């Protein structure tokens, strides 16, 4: 009888743990990698102002990569620019903020841009 009670309590704890961990895993943001940079850029309207190899409203991704190629702090600088927006670096037109982009998606796009915005 006592063993059955112990097993029942252990099973209840195990099930509760699975539910809690499962919920935490479902709530965790998906982690994009640099290979997803182009896909993430397209799905977050980046291509409305930027192109890979030519200036549109904003600089081309290749121009950005060239400007920041020797900057050791390029990833955090550009990630902040994507999240918070900014102006004056590439002209008078401001970069709009993208606060709803996940940190993983921002990092993916920034790393992809700094890699020269490859098409694959």
Question: Which positions does each model-derived feature cover?
Answer:
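N-terminal secretory signal peptides that target proteins for export/translocation
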Residues: 1-9
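Short microdomains enriched in Cys/His and/or Lys/Arg
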Residues: 67-77
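Sec-exported extracytoplasmic/periplasmic mature domains
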Residues: 42, 66-69, 83-87, 111-118
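Axial heme c-ligation environment in periplasmic c-type cytochrome domains
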Residues: 54-66, 81-108
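Electrostatic cytochrome c docking/interface patches
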Residues: 26-41, 67-69
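The canonical Cys-X-X-Cys-His
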Residues: 44-52, 109
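C-terminal segment of classical bacterial N-terminal signal peptides
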Residues: 12-13, 17-29
């Amino acid at each position: 009888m006592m063993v059955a009670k112990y097993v029942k309590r252990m099973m209840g704890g195990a099930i509760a743990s699975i539910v809690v961990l499962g919920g935490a895993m479902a709530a965790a943001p998906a982690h994009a990698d640099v290979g997803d940079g182009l896909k993430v850029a397209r799905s977050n309207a980046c291509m409305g102002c930027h192109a890979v190899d030519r200036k549109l409203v904003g600089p081309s991704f290749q121009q950005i990569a060239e400007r920041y190629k020797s900057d050791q702090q390029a990833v955090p600088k550009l990630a902040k620019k994507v999240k918070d927006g900014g102006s004056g670096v590439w002209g008078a037109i401001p970069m709009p903020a993208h606060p709803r982009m996940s940190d993983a998606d921002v990092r993916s796009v920034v790393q992809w841009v700094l890699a020269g915005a490859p098409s694959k």
